Structure formats: structure tokens, C-alpha cells
């Protein structure tokens, strides 16, 4: 009953208007407001400020700056193995496994297609058919910068407008096609093992999604926007390099080509991850 009410409320709340309202409070520099928000958040989620590059909460300009705080250089070591695919974020695995044809498993009986998720053409979708996927949920208490699972050259980024349902486990199990329905950006990289997709999915009260190459991407428009990247503007990122950030929390979805990687045996649904740890092993070399 409680879960049904939670889902019902999400269906009637104006997602974007509510998120903009929360976004205003998160961006305000009014001292007492931002201090109240930050202090309450640290206490509610037991945030470890000792690992933050700036450990003093009072030194953040606003709640957003605190939320996407940088960590000390040694806080998240990047797996050094040459064949390591690493976690792009702190979070928990929602689902991972093989892509069934062009279908990606969400939860229970819910699936969505590669084309729906990426808003791409058949040619790109076919490159991920039968491949591997992982969905990583970033809770409010997690570090909210997203990093590269492997080194790559950015070739394309799609902005896809949509809803802003919560992406917590309750909603994931009850809203069909959730990750292909919410507002998101899909970044496609060329790697040594073929294409790799990193999708940053927006959610309720996520005021914006940012990338390191184009800054704030959302909220953008009501239309799909496709950007292609090539010379002279080449954007190359190494394994573990930051690629974007959420203001506030959400989900990252990873896609890999068929046969490119093998998930570590101890990585499964509900596994807690830290950015930079090895989650899969590269199976093919260019």
C-alpha cells in the first residue's frame, strides 16, 4: 500500500516544476539556508566528510557544490590492471548481465530496448545487441561524480527529454521502461574494444546533469538533441577520469558490445560499489 501511494504521487506531481523548485534551494547562496540543508543532509545520511577534498561544510558556496564535492586524490584508487573495467560511480548495482537481443532488463517483468535508451539509429543499436549492461543506482549519500569505466574517445552525445520519476528500487520495479522514459544523456565512446555507452539518467529532484566537455546539459528542451564530436574538437578521457556529475542523485547505465567484457563473479544485483574498483574484465583487444 505504501509503495502504491509513492508511485501514485509521482504520477501526479509535476516532475520538472518540482525539480526546479528543489534546484533553487540547492543553488541558493543564502547562508542560513545552504548551511541548514548541508548540515541536515550530512547528519541524515552519515556523510564521510573526511574523504572530501574540502572537509569543512561551511566552505561550500551552496548545497549543489557540497553535493558534487570532489574527493581527496587517494579516496578512490582506480584499478590498475590493464584489462580492468571499473565502476563509474559509487552506488549499488540495480541489474547487470547480458543484453537479450536488443532488450535490457530493468526489474521484475520490465524491459526496455537499446534504441529507446540511447535514442539512436539501428546501426548504433546493433553494435550493442547481445552485449553486456549494468545499471548502477546512486543513492543520496553517494559520491555523485561519474567517471569513465574505460579509456575512450567521445564520438556522440544524445540529450533525451523525458519524465523525472524517482529511480529508487521501488520505482524501478513498478514503472515500465523507467530508464528509457526519464530525462537523460547518452554518451557514446570509441574504445579499444569497440563502442561503449555511458547513460546518465535524471530523476525526481535532479536539478541538472553536467558533463566535463559541455557543462550543464539538463534541463535542456523538449526535443532530442544529438551532438557529434570529431576533429578538431577531440575529447579523449582516460579510465577513471571524471565525465560528468548529477545534481542531485540518479542512475548510470553502461553498455558494452557482445563478447567485449566479462563481469566479475562477485558483482551482482545489490552489490555495493565504489568508483574505480574493478567490475569486469576486458575480453577482447583491438
From Swiss-Prot:
GO biological process, one term: phosphatidylethanolamine biosynthetic process
Top enzyme class: lyase
Post-translational modification: Is synthesized initially as an inactive proenzyme. Formation of the active enzyme involves a self-maturation process in which the active site pyruvoyl group is generated from an internal serine residue via an autocatalytic post-translational modification. Two non-identical subunits are generated from the proenzyme in this reaction, and the pyruvate is formed at the N-terminus of the alpha chain, which is derived from the carboxyl end of the proenzyme.
Pfam families from the UniProt entry: PS_Dcarbxylase
Single GO MF descriptor: phosphatidylserine decarboxylase activity
Annotated catalysed reactions: a 1,2-diacyl-sn-glycero-3-phospho-L-serine + H(+) = a 1,2-diacyl-sn-glycero-3-phosphoethanolamine + CO2
GO cellular component, one term: plasma membrane
Catalytic machinery residues: 90 (charge relay system), 147 (charge relay system), 250 (charge relay system), 250 (schiff-base intermediate with substrate)
Residue numbers of Pyruvic acid (Ser) PTMs: 250
Keywords: Cell membrane, Decarboxylase, Lipid biosynthesis, Lipid metabolism, Lyase, Membrane, Phospholipid biosynthesis, Phospholipid metabolism, Pyruvate, Zymogen
Co-factor binding details: Binds 1 pyruvoyl group covalently per subunit.
Role played: Catalyzes the formation of phosphatidylethanolamine (PtdEtn) from phosphatidylserine (PtdSer).
Protein name: Phosphatidylserine decarboxylase proenzyme
Species per Swiss-Prot/TrEMBL record: Saccharophagus degradans (strain 2-40 / ATCC 43961 / DSM 17024)
High-level lineage: Bacteria, Pseudomonadati, Pseudomonadota, Gammaproteobacteria, Cellvibrionales
